[in-house]
Amino acid sequence: MNARTTAGVATMLGSAASNQIGAAVGAHAFPFIGPAGVVAVRQVVAAAVLLPLARPDVRRFTWPQWWPTLLLAVVFATMNLSLYTAIDRIGLGLAVTLEFLGPLAVALAGSRTRLDLLCAVIACLGVYVLVLPGSSSDFLGIGLGLLAATCWAAYIVLNRVAGARLPGLQAPAVATSISAVLYLPVLLTLHHGGLGYALIAGLLSSAVPYAADLIVLRFVPPRLFGVFMSVHPVFAALAGVALLGQVLHVHHWAGIALVVMANALAVRSSRPRDERTIDAGRTLEGRAIAGG
């Protein structure tokens, strides 16, 4: 790798670390304001970052532009709440790993190659090893993690539609703002305890990764960016252990490794014409607009 690519890789790793450290910091606010409170604050921070950049003129939006934007708002609101509630129930590393099945499913959708089939098998095996279903399993937490994955997949598909009808970041900016408005009832009932944690989480998981992603794509190819996105579950697990005192057993690490492997292989094997579409969805979601 040349110096520019090396700098880009370092920035990507820093962005991933910031994102997951932010999620861990946000978890410290759960006892005070709950997952919904953290999500509410984070959505406000994300909207504050995106609106000045996109500067959308909503008065000129047509219905074909509005409907995917409104659906994006619902997806953002649901994805965040399901992810952060899953983090509260099953831990950061497990929740983020399950969430990553969403973009993986989109990357593999419609594929017929043997390698992509292998990726799907590895991912399914990874999830089974990760959760090892049993009488003590938190199936609600697992279900919420999978709901977050479904929302992320829906985001990628909807963003393709909205991106074809609205230039730049207008659709995500408006959708994030609407999502923040949906959480106004939660914001109005929050007390001051834990707000500092939530604000720091919003900055580390929204503003910093978003700015980093914009810089990174100037230095590294989209496919390399997609591969390095695969480190998020690992960083999430490490942040959970270091900052939240969460305990991960051997089967957890094995499951995370399998999902990361499947995701990286899927991105590396994607056809060149698919690169921009797949990775644009991940980038714009930016680990900044909505998901953890």
Features from the language model and the residues they span:
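Juxtamembrane helix-entry segments on the extracytoplasmic side of multipass membrane proteins
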Residues: A3-G8, F32-A36, A40, F61-W66, ...
